[in-house]
Amino acid sequence: MPLFFGRKRENRADSCEDPVLTALLGSRTVTREMALQVPTVAGGIDLIANLVAGTPIRLYKDTPGAKATEVTNDYRLRLLNDETGDTLNANEFWKAMVRDYYLGKGGYAYINRQGGKVVALHYVEERRITVLKGTDPIFKDFDLAVDGYRYKPYDFLKVLRNTTDGAAGVPLTCESANLIETAYAAQVFEKNMVRRGGNKKGFLKSEKRLDKDSLNELRRGFARLYSADGEGSDNFVLLNNGIDFKESSNTSVELQLNENKLTNAGEFAKLFHVSPDCISGKASEQDVASIARLAAIPLMTTIQCALNKDLLLEREKGQFYFAFDTKELLRGDMKTRFAAYKTALDANFMQIDEVRYAEDMEPLGLDWIRLGLQDVLYNPKTHELFTPNTGTSQQMGQLSLIHI
């Protein structure tokens, strides 16, 4: 097997924000700061980050042939749900990880171990992370460097978007650079219109050649006119005889500005797999439920896989697993839930105490199952039929009745 980390084989991962690469390609770099200036991007990321950060993480023990049992006294649960051992609490930690997941090469957190026990999770800005990749495309391996200090992959919790090597993901600023740049340019265009006070752009037509002093005076006058600070008696331009102002019309662009912003908002909503109404705060119950199923839970699954890989001991893998408690996200509204419970109770595949448990209520200790006298019960193992209304039973295929 080839050596991956010999000094001559050590390569850095190419980044879409590499200034040399950008210069060679001749394209403008879309930064995370530009992306966050677009309200739909900032709102979409914040919406999903709040869902992830507000959903508790549980630890379960999987027992073959039985229901998985929840482990409540594990020390790692406190790090994931409350205090990380760093300056960030768990809520701030997961929000930062989700932002880096969408706008950087991934969310990274250093796993502080002492004697094999995880004592803290330290969030590290993704821009401080350098990926040192091997060159073998089959037996992939890599190291991570932070400010020149080198670490192994198992030293970090990694939450990566659309990764192909397990080391770095693909941010929205690379994958959807054109859409973000278009929306950002619209913001800049609108800002410039406001700064000009609504004054149109145009050009001057002169019947005779102007001297240098006249040109400078015109420049200063129009600078005051288009300046947001110009007001009162300074906010005008005096045109001498023979000079006309011709407006360069961009009315069609201005009229379509709001329409384009709505269109772009819809495109961004597709990137986050949510409805545009969710981001604008006008979501229906169905829209809210779709956020959990289509946007938050897939990201939670990515995080769960990372936790199971990097936080579990080797002897625990296959027996224990971390999972988000998504019950609250998927419960729906009260009317829908209670209608579903009624159907389950009428069909006898749920009991009263099971419904109360699902609603976080104290059980009543009722172990019986409600049956109707009109029912006929059949045991598929013994082929026995029992009729509660008459209190009789018989074997399938036999005509004689056995009275109980």
Predicted regions and their residues:
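Divalent metal-cofactor coordination and adjacent catalytic microenvironments
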Residues: 87-92, 96-106, 131-133, 257, ...
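Small/polar glycine-rich anion-binding or flexible loop at a beta-alpha turn
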Residues: 283-285, 320-328, 358-362
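Short beta-alpha connecting loops at secondary-structure transitions
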Residues: 253, 287-288
